[in-house]
């Protein structure tokens, strides 16, 4: 099923220099006349050249997928006492125009320029001109792929940088190479209309040989919904008269129009019956590690990767394997962790908890000659366990690290179900029966059948008004999408990012205090101050007390402090563990509005010849 990537890899080096500048034009994209594709195979090769960019480590190979979506209230990367202009500056919202990890901006425009070239080449092709504009065909599917990739790149640009240059035609020899920024509302509205135009003439994943490794009709329907909720949501806007000001959070007046679009296109996919949640929650991600890509299940589109070529999934995110030179699975230098308040927000019986929150790591034991589990540091090592190198179809080999070849998930059917429920609730002012059914479908997979009556039907039926249903969706999307670079952007469009981060720090403190003193009560009185573990014969851990605050150590077990470590003492008083003030800095959170957008890199500003500038005090 990696045939598409083998084709992509053959094209990946074309026009991809190691030092790529914003709007730098590489042959053959420097054109003096319009391109035209004379065959489907020619157009297909051109599209593969666009997909090749998506897998680059500056895009979904690592940087865009695994740097830009953090930190938030459920996931974080660790940062230092002093802000750094590295990936850590992205995570703690202190990035300056000199930050070294913003090349994704440039590569998004490389992808856009290649997509624009494909769009022009197909539009000029007799195959396209003579095709039925109302029915799916391969030439029109290829056209839709190009527009979908372009839309995806503009979604990433606008939600990370705000207003950016908007280019809808491939760069040509005589073009203006210094475009200014376009309002993000205009950009998002345009690409939504693009996708609405091409969606009916594309094939569903099940109709394609490459299944979900190519953009397809179902993925485009989901992408329309995601873009529409972003266009209809909140975002930080600049004070054009005062670039040093933080700006303001703003929601467009026409937001309900876009919620209706989100409802319409998510409903369209639901009613098509093309996708289900047949695979278990664990299987969705295990399948990715095993290179299994069903065309009719939860996954709608994932960026194709290849072993020993690209992808940091399983290495920078997933189950942690400490560095060693003996395991055929290599090791994993995991950057991302979950917060303990998130871990303990799951209901009892929710099977997603133990997949999304892993309280252990793997370490090589020289005495036994194998990998064995050890308890994780609860402050900074409880990892997202959706992906594991131990699940890979082909082990990386000794000292294996990056380039796992595990695909990056862009959009799932579960996301479409929850976006539909959200849009319906907003449009009707209360949850509709169809919105409840969509939420129930997601929760049915999350809980065993014997809990469906209580945790699915009773729970959802009890959400009777707009606000309680919305709050439930805020939680559900956290429980469903941990580690998939979705949460931060959800909180932004809901105007909840700053509020949730402030709330998180209070919850961390309360958890530390209340778990140490359960008799004092509070919502965290029953979470464990300590957990207790012993080794099984196979090297895995037998952990007791993970879900209760036990008061004594069971015979044969070792005591290990857990939630109580969220606080430490200073001058005889408990304070929040100091590391959390690095991961979530008060200097950032105390500013209202919180500046979450990244500055445009100083080199891009310099190259723009005055057409671009930074705002928000950056």
Feature locations, PLM:
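Short coil/turn linking the two alpha-helices of tandem helical-hairpin repeats
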Residues: 156-160, 165, 206, 230-239, ...
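Conserved, well-structured interaction surfaces
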Residues: 39, 44-48, 52-58, 80-161, ...
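Bacterial N-terminal signal peptides
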Residues: 7-15
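Elongated scaffold/linker segments in the mid-to-C-terminal portions of large proteins
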Residues: 35, 40-42, 47, 51, ...
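Bacterial Sec-dependent N-terminal signal peptides
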Residues: 3, 15-39, 191, 225, ...
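Short, surface-exposed recognition loops and adjoining beta-strand edges that mediate ligand/DNA contacts
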Residues: 61-80, 167, 203-219, 233-322, ...
């Amino acid at each position: 099923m990696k045939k598409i990537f083998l084709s992509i890899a053959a094209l990946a080096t074309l026009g991809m220099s190691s030092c790529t500048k914003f709007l730098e034009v590489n042959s053959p994209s420097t054109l003096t006349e319009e391109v035209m594709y004379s065959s489907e195979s020619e157009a297909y090769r051109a599209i593969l050249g666009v997909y090749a960019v998506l897998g680059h480590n500056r895009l979904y190979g690592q940087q865009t997928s695994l740097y830009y979506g953090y930190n938030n209230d459920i996931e974080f990367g660790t940062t230092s006492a002093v802000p750094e202009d590295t990936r850590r500056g992205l995570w703690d919202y202190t990035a300056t125009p000199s930050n070294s990890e913003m090349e994704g901006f440039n590569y998004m425009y490389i992808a856009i320029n290649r997509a624009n070239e494909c769009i022009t080449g197909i539009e000029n092709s007799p195959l396209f001109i003579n095709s039925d504009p109302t029915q799916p065909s391969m030439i029109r599917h290829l056209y839709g792929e190009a527009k979908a990739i372009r839309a995806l790149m503009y979604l990433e640009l606008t939600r990370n940088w705000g207003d950016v240059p908007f280019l809808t035609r491939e760069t040509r020899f005589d073009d203006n190479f210094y475009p200014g920024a376009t309002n993000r509302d205009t950009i998002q509205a345009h690409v939504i209309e693009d996708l609405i135009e091409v969606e009916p003439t594309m094939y569903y994943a099940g109709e394609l040989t490459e299944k979900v490794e190519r953009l397809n009709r179902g993925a485009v329907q989901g992408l329309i919904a995601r873009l529409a909720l972003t266009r209809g949501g909140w975002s930080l806007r600049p004070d054009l008269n005062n670039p040093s000001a933080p700006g303001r959070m703003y929601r467009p007046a026409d937001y309900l129009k876009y919620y209706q679009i989100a409802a319409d296109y998510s409903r369209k996919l639901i009613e098509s019956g093309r996708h289900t949640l047949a695979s278990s929650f664990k299987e969705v991600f295990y399948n990715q590690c095993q290179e299994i890509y069903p065309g009719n299940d939860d996954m709608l589109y994932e960026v194709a990767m290849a072993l020993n070529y690209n992808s940091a999934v399983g290495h920078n995110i997933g189950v942690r394997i400490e560095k060693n030179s003996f395991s055929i699975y290599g090791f994993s230098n995991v950057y991302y962790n979950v917060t303990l308040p998130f871990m303990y927000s799951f209901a009892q019986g929710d099977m997603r908890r133990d997949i999304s929150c892993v309280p252990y790591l793997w370490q090589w034991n020289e005495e036994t000659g194998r990998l064995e589990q050890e308890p994780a540091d609860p402050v900074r090592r409880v990892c997202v366990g959706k992906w594991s190198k131990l699940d890979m179809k082909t082990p990386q080999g000794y000292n294996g690290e990056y380039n796992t070849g595990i695909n990056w998930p862009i959009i799932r059917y579960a996301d479409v179900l929850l976006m539909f429920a959200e849009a319906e609730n907003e449009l009707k002012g209360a949850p509709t029966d169809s919105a409840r059914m969509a939420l129930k479908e997601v929760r049915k997979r999350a809980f065993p059948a014997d809990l469906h009556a209580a945790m699915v039907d009773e729970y959802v039926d009890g959400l009777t008004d707009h606000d309680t249903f919305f709050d439930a969706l805020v939680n559900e999307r956290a429980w469903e999408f941990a580690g998939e670079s979705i949460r931060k952007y959800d909180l932004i469009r809901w105007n909840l990012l700053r509020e949730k981060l402030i709330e998180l720090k209070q919850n961390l403190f309360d958890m530390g205090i209340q778990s140490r003193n359960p008799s004092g009560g509070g919502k965290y009185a029953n979470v464990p101050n300590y957990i207790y573990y012993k080794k099984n014969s196979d090297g895995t851990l037998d952990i007791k007390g993970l879900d209760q605050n036990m008061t004594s150590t069971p015979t044969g077990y070792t005591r290990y402090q857990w939630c109580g470590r969220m606080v430490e003492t200073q001058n005889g008083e408990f304070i929040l563990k100091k590391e959390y003030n690095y991961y979530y800095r008060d200097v950032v959170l105390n500013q209202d509005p919180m500046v979450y957008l990244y500055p445009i890199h100083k080199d891009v500003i310099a190259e723009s010849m005055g057409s671009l500038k930074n705002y928000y005090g950056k």
